[in-house]
Amino acid sequence: IWPRKIYKTNCQGNYKTKKSKKIKSTFDLVRIIEKTVPKKFQMGSIHCATRTFQALRIAVNKELDNLKEFLPQAFGMLAPKGRLVVISFHSLEDRVVKNFFKDIFEKGVVKILTKKPITADTNEVLANPKSRSAKLRAVIKS
């Protein structure tokens, strides 16, 4: 929903003048996002532009592609009874890890040590707010 609204707000420009505005800085992008996202979704401790910048970072750094390439390599280096433990910080990463672990489990080459991901408890999140989205998954090679 938001990408379409951001496009309409910025790329299509003002409907009366038909001028498109150039984004010259991250502050310009934040301003556009703040104008686009309804106020009721701007409440809370996480800024409404956070996910947009996260999506840009993930795409530019090819984080999901790198993770998909890394996991089989890391698993291939494990000795028998070796453990592969992965911490993910957002749902897209977690889905890649979960699916990889599921695939190798179905091949019978690992035992899953964490049926559900381990997440930070309330005390940890209070002490370390960045841990709120962390999910730990682990397998042991047969």
Question: What are the residue ranges of the model-derived segments?
Answer:
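S-adenosyl-L-methionine-dependent methyltransferase catalytic core, i.e., the SAM/SAH-binding region
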Residues: 1-142
